[in-house]
Each structure stands twice: as structure tokens, then as C-alpha cells.
Amino acid sequence: MNKPANFSNIHKYYDLINTITTLGFDKSWRSQAARNLNPGSVLDLVSGTGASYKDLNNFDVTALDPDEQMLSLNKFDRKIVGRGEDLPFNENSFDNVLCCFVWRNISETEKAMNEIYRVLKPGGKFILLDMTRPKNSTLRILHKIGTFILLHFIGLITMNFKEYRFLYKSLDFYPQPEIHLNKNEYLSLDITRFGLFGFVYLAVFTK
């Protein structure tokens, strides 16, 4: 999987782009994801600028992201530079792991899933919120056309074409979540789709 060197060039616009590509529903969907969390500690995986900050006020949060410039805008008190494929934490460290709108940008999701399982406490939850393509083939084509135009246009006007082209292509990196995410044998799973055409999914894993 070919990733851009980093998202440092677009860190100031990253949250705005999430809002645009989710038709303005990203904040309400983040809140919906947070409502599925257990009480206690949360690892905000690939936290970026900390867009889930307002939804996690009542939790003990550790924000982790590979990009220091993203973390420089992050409001969480505890911030760590790191990758999901190699989490710098002991086993059974967290009551929850939360990952919003970035799972498709993780290079080795199988490794990341194993690491998440390792750091979750027994009974802990992994809450995954992300975008995908619609199931219906006709709607999938329409979604591809719409996101192609939108993300390439944003890339051109911000002069960061490579990063936004990557975000467009990342929607096709993995199979449908109902197939891709069911490969893990250690965590029970429940998936809900919402948004126009069902292009956003919420997956709730329990250890």
C-alpha cells in the first residue's frame, strides 16, 4: 500500500475535510461512536488533531498518532507519537480503543488488530468508525465519482494533490467491512452502516 510520506502538509485542513466528505455528519457520528465506550480509559488510536476531544471529556484518554504536527493541534493532555502496528503499551492497559475515520490509512491492519487485542483489558471494546464504499454496485459507482471530484478538487485548491488523491484511493484499499473485519477470531463484532448510501460504518468489537 503506497502511503504519502505524512499528512503534515494538510494537518490544518484535515478535520475540515472529514466534515466535508461526511456531509457535515462527522461530529454526530463521533458522538455516536463514543456512546458505545465502556467507562474508564481510552486509547484514541491515530488521534490526529483530537477531533473526538469533546466526546471524551469523561474518560482517561491517551492520544496516539504517528504525526507530530497533527499532535501539536491535539487538545488531549497525554499525547504519544506512535503507530497502531506497534503500540508502546503493556498488555491489558485500556478499557477501550477508539479509532475514527483513519482505519483505512493504517498500512498493516492485521498487525494493528493484534496490537489492539493485546492492549485491551478483558471485556474491553474497540470502537471503529470509518468511511467505505456503499454495498450497492450502482451507488458505489456514484460514490466513487462524487468523492473523486470532491477530493481531487480540494487537493488542487490546497496545492496538496498527493495527499488528497491518497485519501480518495484509500476508500478502496480494503474489502467491504463486513468481510474485512470478520477475519479476527478473538473479538466479537457488530457492524452498523449509516450515512448517504451507507458509506460510513460503525464497528463495535468486544474482547
Which residues does each PLM region occupy?
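A short SAM/SAH-binding and catalytic strip from SAM-dependent methyltransferases
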Residues: 96-108
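Conserved beta-strand signature within the Rossmann-like core of class I S-adenosyl-L-methionine
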Residues: 124-131
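Class I SAM-dependent methyltransferase SAM/SAH-binding core
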Residues: 43-86
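N-terminal, positively charged/glycine-rich alpha-helical extensions of SAM-dependent methyltransferases
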Residues: 1-13, 146
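A short glycine-rich, Lys/Arg-flanked "PGG" loop and its adjoining helix->strand segment in the class I
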Residues: 110-122
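Conserved alpha-helix/loop element of class I SAM-dependent methyltransferases that forms part
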Residues: 22-39
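C-terminal alpha-helical "lid/dimerization" subdomain adjacent to the S-adenosyl-L-methionine
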Residues: 20-21, 52, 132-182
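A short acidic, Gly/Pro-enriched loop at the edge of an enzyme's catalytic core
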Residues: 85-97
